[in-house]
């Protein structure tokens, strides 16, 4: 079992890094965990739609280069399916029962994910209709994956 969180951009703030490290340690009891960061594309503050698409394309190529062919890709998208914590646990459990064991959760940059990445996705997951900073989403995601494993194992975890 392997969980990869693949994200555009680098975690800079110490407090985000500490939170991630804590959940990596906790999750390590259930699964191999890997965090992969790909560089975000340098871009001006204001861009045309065409320029935004070009940025997404370049970031998308970097993301896709990190995904193995056998991986189950779960993209984080505003338009994705919203699940409860129990729902995420059930989704992962069903996929594991089907023999899937290499999960890659993909978090895009500030402009979102390129269509090529969306096309590679096996499941589109949404945490909210709201937009969150991608650094924060890494922490929220890894916590929810940890919570899902606790639920799957029937272990207590605070609510």
Curated annotation (Swiss-Prot):
Main location: cytoplasm
Chain positions recorded as S-adenosyl-L-methionine binding sites: 76, 108, 127-132
UniProt GO MF annotations: rRNA (pseudouridine-N3-)-methyltransferase activity
Group of enzyme by EC: transferase
Gene Ontology CC terms: cytoplasm
Pfam family, one: SPOUT_MTase
Subcellular localization(s) per the UniProt record: Cytoplasm
UniProt KW keywords: Cytoplasm, Methyltransferase, rRNA processing, S-adenosyl-L-methionine, Transferase
EC number of this enzyme: 2.1.1.177
SUPFAM superfamilies linked: alpha/beta knot
Catalytic activity: pseudouridine(1915) in 23S rRNA + S-adenosyl-L-methionine = N(3)-methylpseudouridine(1915) in 23S rRNA + S-adenosyl-L-homocysteine + H(+)
Top-level taxon of origin: Bacteria
Subunit organization: Homodimer.
Family: Belongs to the RNA methyltransferase RlmH family.
Protein purpose: Specifically methylates the pseudouridine at position 1915 (m3Psi1915) in 23S rRNA.
Protein name: Ribosomal RNA large subunit methyltransferase H
């Amino acid at each position: 079992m392997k969980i990869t969180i693949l994200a555009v951009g680098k975690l800079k703030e110490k407090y985000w890094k500490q939170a991630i490290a804590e959940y990596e340690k906790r999750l390590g009891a259930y699964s191999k965990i890997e965090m992969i960061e790909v560089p975000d594309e340098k871009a001006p503050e204001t861009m045309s739609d065409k320029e935004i698409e070009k940025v997404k394309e370049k970031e998308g190529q970097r993301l896709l280069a990190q995904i193995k062919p056998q991986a189950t890709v779960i993209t984080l998208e505003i338009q994705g399916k919203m699940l409860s914590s129990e729902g995420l646990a059930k989704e992962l459990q069903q996929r594991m029962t089907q023999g899937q064991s290499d999960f890659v959760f993909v978090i895009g940059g500030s402009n979102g994910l390129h269509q090529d990445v969306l096309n590679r996705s096996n499941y589109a997951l949404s945490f909210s209709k709201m937009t969150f900073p991608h650094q924060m989403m890494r922490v929220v995601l890894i916590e929810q994956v940890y919570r899902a494993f606790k639920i799957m194992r029937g272990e207590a975890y605070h609510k």
